[in-house]
Amino acid sequence: MKNNIEEQLELPCGSILSNRLCKTAMTEGLSDQLNRSTDELCTLYEKWSKSGASLLITGNVQIDRRYMERAGNVAIDGKQSNIQIEKLKKWASAAKINGNHCWVQLGHAGRQTDARINKVGLGPSPIRSRNIAGQIFMPSYAPKEISKREIDSIINKFSYAAKICKEVGFSGIQIHSAHGYLLSSFLNPLANVRTDNYGGKLENRYRLLLEIINAARRTVGPNFPISVKINSSDFLRGGLTDQESATICKALDSERIDLLEISGGSYENLAIFRGKDAFNDKNINEAYFLDSSREILNTIKNTPIMLTGGIRKLSTMNDLISNHNIDMIGLARPLCGLIDGPKKLIKKEIYELPKYEDKINYPFFLRWLKIFRFGKVIYKAAILLWCYDNIINISKNMPFDSKGEKINLINIIIKMYIYEWKKASSLKKIKSRGLVYRQNF
């Protein structure tokens, strides 16, 4: 019997995805000192192109080099040199070598800007993130409140970056409005207390997102896929609720976007890492954000929906597509170890992807830390650091941990901490001031 994941999907713009599996965005940290694409990115994405997934979405490509979530982000910020264009073309070509789609995730780190690069992030309001779990060793600072002039500039930067992505050969873009980054923080009433047209009531808080989508659409035309990634909920008391998210998604559904990816949480909350209900600590073993997405699923009429977060079993994937109005399945961490996991699922060589997060080696003398929130953050952040390390090794054609046998908490934290520090120290020609990189604005 044919799996549901094998079925094609036609997008509203007319593009066709050959199956229902997507490698979703994961930050790679592989750019050069000028935040340009590299041969390592080409190697990595050529391998993922052969994974069997019909769609690859790149990690954060920043539209402003001053505000990056990692020093190794690629950036499309302003006029691109001939060298930059050629590097992007090479990346796009490698990422589509197997006939799949590759879309660029465009984003702005906002108040979650890596403090090693820039201590002064940018936010809708000057409100500091309460706990940046993803940067557990980095202090967070109150961001600068974005002005109307800067809002206009950001809209133009997203639109221009979308234009470049189309010109160099990528097959679509995704606008990142989840996980607490700039566009997500505009939606979050805890982060956005503005009193102008971009704050206050819900339709004002999602105004910037709609303006960016419309500007990008005018630039790339009607036949180029545009996706949006959004939280089903922030899982923060007083933050964006699932009901509000459903209202936003209804507005997006009228904007003729081509794929809506549903995720959840932010670096202020463990839901992004652990797959638990943030309010009652209830374990959710698969499809972390399905329950919080119910209202969205009942609201959307025109836009295909992709669900991301903890989906591992083939039976679950097929059930989501058959019975829950899910059109695409988003996969991330498993493809850092089992690169050809989608192909194996389609061929029924396997029936479940590995759950590497269950294999973390927490030293015995530190296990008591898991009692506390801080310890839980470190424990769950370790799997992301393991993904980062594997991504680096895969990109360099080096041996990597395909079975999750080397997830040692302390070793991986130290190794990646050094890597990130060196990467931030190596940046060139960027005007910002951080804990490592110290040019003046």
List each model region and its residues.
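Flavin-dependent oxidoreductase catalytic cores
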Residues: 1-441
